[in-house]
Swiss-Prot record:
Belongs to the AF4 family. Residues 577-586 have a biased composition (Gly residues). This is AF4/FMR2 family member lilli. Residues 443-454 have a biased composition (Acidic residues).
Length: 1673
């Protein structure tokens, strides 16, 4: 080992020399500045440097890898091979000039930090890209020096600190040695920016979105917190997994070494400085750390010396072991031996072999953390931040430690070491990076920081933990930091920082709950060293925090995702999104609480990154992963993390100020309960702690990364239980936290098994926990609360109070587990009315009992109507669920629907921490909450607000209070609270919204949220909850649509209530599989729809999707049964919107139609609120259903929803027996299909009251309309022209590919319809026999008024067993939709609606007889291709690219298909040229294309002549058919282009032949020439046959005519050839299927139709070749 180490050191030094070349001078300066410590460190430098170099090798670029290869060669020569040489892809160094601002700032900021980092900080994840790598962590001690040389910019920035930490002489010597040895092999740094392309080099190890655990340096170097984040996470995980063991033997010193392989634990702040320096961005935080003093003396040298001595004594041996172990860890990480990036992100050291060693290190790290914890207690902000940062991410710890050092120089030695130990613990690679990035980006403005972090996290969450995104790293670090801080501060600083910490805790509630559970587990297991029990406890939390906190953080934040990796399920996803979420949450918590906190400003994360003054601690991005809610700490914004007991089951972190002490006591119980519940399979729905400074856009982005953002406890048991409970239990809540970036950081949706599964809507910050799906049968009924309340809360006055809502404790263990960080500072004000009104005690243990209702009991209640157990993870929502549910229900019934709406909005806005708006409160007076006074938490909405607030807090919570409770109102604007009042079907759609997060957990939470919203806003909703459950399926559909809307609306908290029942779960899972595809499109569409600036709330606007029917029902129908019936129709529209098959336009239209009324109807919110009536959605959906019902809407509708809602009425048309409850049609809100030719029927109610009245009218009319609709369905089936159905099909065919896919999914149904239809019928008169959408819509418009009621009736009659009729009745064109399922794709002539309807819906309505649909040629859709030349150029480029690819293709089939694709793209180009280019150019393009396709056809001939029994020949024959069709149409087009010329030629020739002009060449005609000549002429003429002389012009015309007519002849001839080949080759089924899906291809087809048709055919053929069993006939 000694030789190997030396070799490695030399090689690494060589590597270092190259990486140091850029950072050498800066690192030398740092070394010189820190010579005293460096001398002490020199002894340790060698080993540390070796470790650092070793870790760097994994972060190196090509030259570094070459060095590593050289080193490996040497090792092989010595018989030593490094297991991880494959994995050690060195993170590319960030090349920064010595004068680089980032480096300068980092060095200056980290001047003292460097000393500490060199001496103490091993866990500076940013210092070395490899820091995040388990293998790198052991080496991080040397990395202090190597960081100075680390290839990554982060390492270069932090490297100087590290180098200074190591003696400048030894560093130089090492550099010299390195240069001496590897110069031959080592490729010097080439100044190339880190390669971020595939995440290959800097982030290559991050195959599974693990940033740089493969040892790659952050791609962007210091500025890239993301890459650093991955490193940080890797380091954290490695430190915890690889470094912790060393840490245990080493004790605190090892702990310091562990994060970066250097002695980071003692110099926690310097280590963060290194991380920041490494990140390069964190230089400003360093500056803020020492703003006035360029070099503040590090903590007393005693500490430094002690650290150095400890490192020298302990680290000397440990580094070898760590180094020896590192190869394994990197290899495993890079190659995902056990799980994708499991080891990288998994802080569960025991689970990951590479992390096994770090596990030991982690314990010592925590021990060191404990020592700093005392100072942390002394300086709560710094201490909490430092331990959190350390525990969560080395980078954060380093940055934070530095900042606290600056602020508290005397305390900082301990705090720094404590922070440093957390740094090694930082298992959340991304967390660390997030925190750093936030520091980098938004240090100056907490709100700005949190928002930017949200966006960054979104990106990084999406990148799945890629190290390329620094914001993710930063936010993750922040979140991890916050979590660690919360954990550290939990006991000593709990009350001190309670307000500040509350916000962070609320943001990180889920994380804290998980962490606290782990803490409790680990509390029983005292940490290795460092004295105080609190410290021990914190260290335990942190040490486990690597394992558990990181797991928790991983579930809560991106960075911590790694911990989940060992747990296995969402390791990768958790990491990427988790850190982003964590970062946002962390920053949100910081901002929301105390934006400027001198201690926080001293943090390395933000102050260093932003060069901010030490006192100006802008909210560091505290991502749930970064901030350890368990450890009390101060978040970057000054928010204190008061560790609240992590209730795993509750998944809500107690964060109420009043109950903080009690919460601490309860935390353990809650943690235990959470563990039990998780183990028990209950999905805990800790709603993500509300983050104050969340950008709605960031929210959306985070929402997109729900899984990665999922907080998961590192404890594998908890993770397993959680994961098993909700396939993405953490994802729901943590994704909500991550979606709300800032708002939902703490919130974590712990998957509640079965009905309690937690859904995380991707676009919805709030995690939705489905409470018990007690009434699967009821789910058939359309719950009155089909309404989706999407309340994106824009900057409302002061909504942080809502954040105060206690996370609802399941089983009342954690009274405020989910207390939203948003209101941490003002929890009492937030809930003055809310807490007192709904339960009067959100922050009190009594609330906990109420929260029991929130917990599992709430699921029980859900059956009772308040099924949103998880919906409001916050304690307030649990309060609502408890007694408030019934209270709310009664008032709601009594209160007018407007009141219920107001409550919904109020409590939505409140939950989005916009609850400050008294308007909302007033709107929801009906609630138990006489204390409407918490304006944001109106009395009525107090419980509802708690629910909404808990869910919204997890979602909007962060967004509204993203920066700080007070500050975030502006930022809150992005928040949306989507309250889906229907319980049954929500999970399916919640899944759609949830995206990657587990739909069930999200759905359950949504359900809870919905229930809470209903309960809070109108407790009558709670009464309706049983109807919701009764109609869970239809509700589910609606929830999905609203969920989609909310997620698409960006900030929208799509809370889908999925309490339908076990049936719904099965259906939801089916929908989960189907819907996600179209969910993205839907989300995009809905985002556009709801962007306040763009007529919607694109991640910013407030959208309230409310089922007006539901509200009306609540107001009108005290009985839940009636409300359930009216809500069934809204559920159907929701299903339509949620249905993945639905085309984006349809979704957009649906969303738009709903959005208009929503906006109009929700004046209560200060910010824009789009109130979408689901009943309206139902109509639109019904219209779509008309087209799509038979074929399951071609996937546009919600066939999945229907299947899932089989018991319910298909397509969200719950068979509600209560017609009154169903939304009639809101007649005032008429769909204006003509306005939107597609499906976008815009319902424009005159006002909210009118809508309510309409709903009430629906209640009356629905029963009548039931019969009417049944008759209409029959009549329509008979009468409605196929054209209309075609129309729908054509509109659906607007997205032919989606429709094709959907139809393929429903191939059986489609085939049924096809079989029923004769071929001629299947091929209608022409391709374009699609009724114009306008015509259809106009027809629909007329019928919508009728069908609105009919739809309600249909929903009501769905229980009667005629869902298809209902669908038809509900749909403006019920018969066409039935028939149109197949035609919906395009021009399908015939379609059987009843079969599709029956197939789609569990309830089999009477199947109408098969009907043939005939479409008129004039009904075809008129396409208006764009004249944009850019698009034409795009087509041309696509064609050229495909042709070149085909030229190089060797496989005959692939070549032919590529050529044919190129041809159709050329056709699109030529078609576009017809409108913007000359006729000649267009003609040339077509001619060239024809020549190309003729050339292609030569490749088919060999196969066409052979037997078609061969699959290959069959496929070639089919391609030949498509080719012949294309040739025919191109020939016809060439003729049409010349038709005018041809006509003129024909006229001229006709005249010529009629007049008989032209001389006879050899006749008796006398010659005018002389006789002598005449004889000769005659003699010569006698040689020519007699004939007529044709003038040249006539000859030319004849030639042209021949050419033109040959085109025409070829067109028909080629077409006939294709037809013959179809018949002879027995390919009729293949063509028929294409015709059904894309409309028949005829000689009238446009080039766009040809393109669509051919592309569909080629795709089918490719699929057939890839999967022969599935190839079409």
């Amino acid at each position: 080992m000694a030789q190997q180490q030396q070799q490695q050191m030399q090689q690494q030094q060589q590597h270092h020399t190259s990486s140091i070349n850029n950072n050498n001078s800066s690192s030398i300066v740092l070394l010189q500045q820190q010579q005293p410590q460096q001398q002490q460190q020199q002894l340790d430098q060698l080993q540390q440097y070796n470790n650092n170099l070793y870790s760097q090798n994994y972060n190196m670029e090509e030259y570094e890898r070459r060095k590593r290869r050289e080193r490996e060669k040497i090792e092989r020569q010595q018989g030593i091979q490094i297991d991880d040489r494959e994995t050690s892809l060195f993170g590319e160094p960030r090349r920064l000039t010595e004068g680089d601002a980032e480096i300068t700032a980092a060095l200056g900021e980290f001047f003292e930090a460097r000393e500490y980092i060199n001496n103490q900080t091993v866990g500076i994840s940013r210092s070395a890209p490899g820091a995040g790598n388990p293998r790198l962590q052991p080496n991080l001690a040397p990395q202090a020096k190597s960081l100075g040389h680390s290839p990554s910019s982060a390492s270069s920035a932090a490297g100087p600190t590290a180098a200074s930490a190591t003696t400048s002489l030894p560093g130089q010597q090492q550099h010299y040695q390195q240069q001496q040895r590897p110069p031959t092999y080592v490729k010097q740094a080439d100044n190339k920016p880190p390669y971020n392309g595939r995440g290959g080099y800097p982030g290559q190890p991050m195959k599974n979105d693990i940033p740089s655990s493969s040892g790659m340096a952050p791609p962007r170097g210091p500025p890239r917190t993301s890459s650093s984040n991955s490193n940080s996470s890797s380091v954290t995980n490695n430190a915890s997994s690889g470094g912790v063991p060393a840490s245990t033997p080493l004790g605190p010193p090892l702990s310091t070494q562990m994060p970066n392989g250097r002695e980071k634990s003692f110099l926690g702040p310097p280590a963060p400085a290194l991380h920041n320096g490494t990140g390069g961005r964190f230089v400003p935080p360093a500056a803020s750390k020492r703003p006035g003093v360029g070099q503040q003396p590090p903590p007393p040298e005693k500490d430094v010396n002690k650290i150095i001595s400890d490192i020298a004594n302990i680290f000397t041996v440990q580094p070898l072991t760590l180094i020896a172990a590192t190869p394994h860890a990197p290899t495993r990480e890079n190659y995902n031996l056990l799980a994708p990036n499991r080891q990288k992100y998994a802080m569960d050291i025991p689970s990951s072999p590479p992390s096994a060693e770090p596990s030991s290190l982690m314990t010592p790290l925590f021990a060191p953390i404990t020592s700093p914890i005392a100072p942390l207690v002394t300086t709560p902000p710094q201490a909490s931040q430092m331990p959190l940062g350390g525990a969560t991410s080395g980078t954060i710890l380093a940055g934070e430690a530095l900042a606290p050092l600056h602020q508290l120089p005397p305390t900082m030695p301990k705090a720094a070491s404590g922070v440093t130990s957390p740094g090694p613990v930082k298992p959340l690679k991304t967390e660390k990076n997030h925190s750093l990035e936030k520091q980098d980006s938004c240090l100056e403005n907490d709100l700005e920081l949190s928002e930017s972090e949200d966006e960054q996290r979104k990106k990084e969450g999406r990148s799945g933990g890629n190290s390329s995104n620094s914001s993710e790293s930063d936010s993750s670090e922040s979140g991890s930091e916050s979590s660690s801080k919360n954990d550290l501060q939990h006991h000593p600083n709990h009350q001190q920082h309670h307000h500040q910490l509350q916000q962070q805790q609320q943001q990180q509630q889920a994380t804290m709950q998980q962490q606290q559970v782990l803490q409790q587990q680990h509390r029983s297991q005292p940490l290795t060293s460092n004295g105080a029990q609190n410290k021990k406890f914190r260290h335990e939390i942190i040490a486990r925090g690597s394992n558990t906190i990181t797991g928790l953080l991983s579930s809560s934040g991106f960075g911590s995702g790694g911990n989940v990796g060992p747990a296995g399920v969402n390791s990768n996803a958790v990491v990427g999104t988790g850190s982003g979420s964590g970062g946002t949450l962390s920053s949100g918590g910081s901002s929301s609480n105390k934006t400027p906190s001198p201690t926080e400003s001293n943090k390395w994360n933000l102050s260093r990154f932003f060069h901010k003054p030490a006192n100006q601690t802008n909210s560091e991005s505290v991502s749930p992963g970064n901030v350890s809610m368990k450890v009390p700490g101060i978040l970057p914004g000054g928010a204190q993390i008061i560790p609240e007991s992590i209730d795993v089951t509750t998944a809500i972190v107690k964060n109420e100020k009043n109950d903080m002490a009690m919460e601490e006591g309860e935390e353990e119980d809650d943690d235990e309960e959470q563990q039990l519940r998780y183990g028990g399979g209950l999905s805990v729905t800790p709603v993500a702690v509300k983050k104050e400074a969340i950008d709605a856009v960031s929210e959306m982005a985070l929402g997109a990364i729900p899984k990665t953002q999922i907080k998961r406890e590192s404890a594998e048991t908890l993770l397993s239980a959680r994961l098993s409970d909700s396939g993405t239990s953490a994802s729901g809540s943590s994704s909500s936290s991550s979606s709300s970036s800032d708002s939902a950081m703490g919130g974590e949706v712990v998957p509640m098994p079965g009905p309690g599964e937690t859904l995380q809507l991707p676009g919805v910050p709030a995690a939705i926990t489905t409470v018990m799906r007690v009434q699967p049968t009821q789910s058939q009924k359309a719950p009155p609360s089909n309404s989706v309340t999407l309340t994106p809360i824009l900057p409302l006055p002061t909504s942080p109070k809502q954040r105060q809502k206690k996370p609802r404790k399941k089983k009342a263990i954690t009274s405020a587990p989910i207390l939203d960080s948003s209101d941490d500072d003002e929890p009492p004000p937030k809930h003055p009315g809310l807490d007192h009104t709904a339960v009067s005690v959100q922050t009190q243990p009594a609330t906990d009992t109420v929260k029991k209702g929130r917990g599992r009991p709430r699921k029980q209640q859900q059956s009772g109507g308040s099924g949103n157990l998880s919906s409001a993870s916050a304690g307030s929502s649990s309060q609502t669920k408890g007694p408030t549910l019934t209270a709310a229900k009664k008032p709601l019934a009594k209160t007018p629907l407007a009141m219920s709406r107001a409550r919904k909005r109020e409590h939505s806005s409140q939950s989005s921490s916009n609850g400050n708006t008294p308007t909302k409160k007033v709107a929801t007076p009906q609630l138990v909450a006489a204390p409407l006074k918490p304006t944001s938490n109106t009395a009525g909405s107090s419980s509802s607000d708690e629910d909404s607030s808990s869910s919204a807090e997890s979602s909007s919570k962060s967004s509204s209070s993203s920066s700080s409770s007070d500050d975030t109102e502006t930022q809150n604007t992005n928040c949306r609270i989507v309250k889906l009042n229907k319980t049954g079907a929500v999970q399916k759609k919640a899944l759609l919204g949830s995206g990657s997060s587990s739909p069930s957990s999200s759905g359950s939470e949504a359900e809870d949220q919905t229930t809470r919203s209903q309960v809070g806003s109108g407790q009558a909703l709670a009464q309706q909850l049983p109807p919701y459950k009764q109609l869970p399926i239809s509700q589910h559909s609606q929830h999905l649509s609203s969920s989609d809307c909310s997620s698409s609306s960006g900030g929208c908290t799509a809370v889908c209530s999925s309490s339908s029942g076990e049936e719904d779960e099965g259906r939801r899972e089916k929908e989960r599989e189907r819907k996600p595809k179209s969910d993205k499109n839907k989300i995009n569409t809905l985002t556009r729809i709801f962007n306040p600036k763009e007529g919607g709330a694109k991640k910013q606007g407030q959208v309230v999707i409310v089922d007006l029917q539901e509200e009306q029902q609540q107001g009108k129908l005290d009985a839940a049964a009636q409300p359930s019936a009216p809500q069934a129709p809204p559920a159907a529209p929701a299903a339509i919107m949620a249905k993945p098959r639905m085309t984006p336009t349809q979704q957009q239209q649906l969303g738009a139609g709903l959005a208009s009324p929503a906006r109009t109807t929700t004046p209560h919110l200060t910010s824009l609120i789009c109130k979408i009536d689901l009943s309206k959605l139902s109509r639109e959906r019904i219209m779509r259903l008309k087209k799509l019902t038979p074929a399951q809407q071609n996937g546009h509708l919600t066939p999945k929803d229907q299947a899932t809602n089989a018991v319910h009425v298909p397509n969200g048309y719950a068979g509600d027996t209560n017609p009154a409850a169903k939304v009639k049609h809101e007649h005032p809100v008429k769909p204006e299909p003509e306005l939107d030719a597609g499906y976008e029927a815009k319902f424009k109610p005159g006002n909210v009251k009118q809508e309510f009245q309409l709903k009430q009218e629906r209640d009356r009319d629905r029963e009548r309309e039931r019969e009417r609709e049944r008759e209409r369905e029959r009549d329509r089936e008979r009468e409605q022209p196929p054209g209309r159905r075609r129309k729908r099909s054509s509109s659906s065919s607007s997205s032919p590919y989606k429709e094709k896919k959907r139809k393929k999914e429903k191939a059986d149904q489609l085939q049924m319809g096809k079989e029923l239809l004769p071929v001629p019928v299947l091929l209608p008169s022409n391709n374009h026999e699609r009724m114009p959408n306008h015509d259809r819509l106009s027809y629909d418009k007329l019928q919508l008024l009728h069908e609105d009621a009919a739809a309600v009736i249909g929903d009501v009659s769905a229980p009667n067993g005629s869902p298809t009729k209902k669908l038809l009745a509900m749909s403006p064109l019920p018969p066409p939709p039935t028939v149109t399922v197949a035609p919906a794709t395009c021009n399908e002539a015939v379609q059987t609606t009843p079969p599709s309807a029956t197939a789609t819906s569990a309830i089999a309505p009477p199947v109408p007889a098969t009907r043939l649909i005939y479409r008129s040629y004039f009904d075809r859709d008129v396409e208006h291709p764009s004249d944009d030349p850019r698009k034409n150029n795009q087509f041309l480029q696509e064609a050229i690219n495909r042709k070149h690819a085909a030229d190089l293709e060797r496989d005959s089939f692939n070549q032919v298909t590529l050529y044919l694709e190129a041809v159709v793209y050329f056709l699109l180009t030529a078609d576009a040229m017809e409108r913007c280019s000359s006729e000649q150019a267009t003609n040339t393009m077509y001619k060239d294309t024809l020549s190309l396709i003729k050339f292609i056809s030569t490749k088919f001939r060999p196969y066409q002549q052979q037997s078609t029994t061969n699959i290959q020949h069959e496929t070639h024959n089919k391609v030949a058919i498509l080719s012949l069709r294309c040739q025919s149409l191109i020939s016809l087009k060439l003729y049409k282009l010349r038709r005018k010329d041809c006509r003129a030629i024909i006229n001229s020739l006709t005249d010529f032949f009629r007049v008989g002009r032209g001389d006879i060449a050899n006749g008796n005609t006398p010659s005018s020439i002389s006789p002598s000549n005449s004889v000769g002429s005659q003699g010569s003429g006698s040689n020519t046959p007699p004939g007529r002389i044709v003038p040249p012009d006539i000859h030319n015309m004849l030639c042209k005519q021949n050419e033109f007519l040959s085109y025409l002849n070829s067109a028909h001839e080629l077409w006939d050839q294709a037809d013959r080949l179809v018949r002879t080759g027995n390919h009729i089924d293949f063509i028929r299927e294409l015709d059904h899906e894309n409309g028949p291809l005829t000689l009238h087809s446009t080039m766009h139709e040809v393109f669509r048709y051919v592309q569909a055919g080629l795709k089918t053929l490719r699929d057939a070749v890839s999967h022969p069993t599935h190839q079409s006939q």
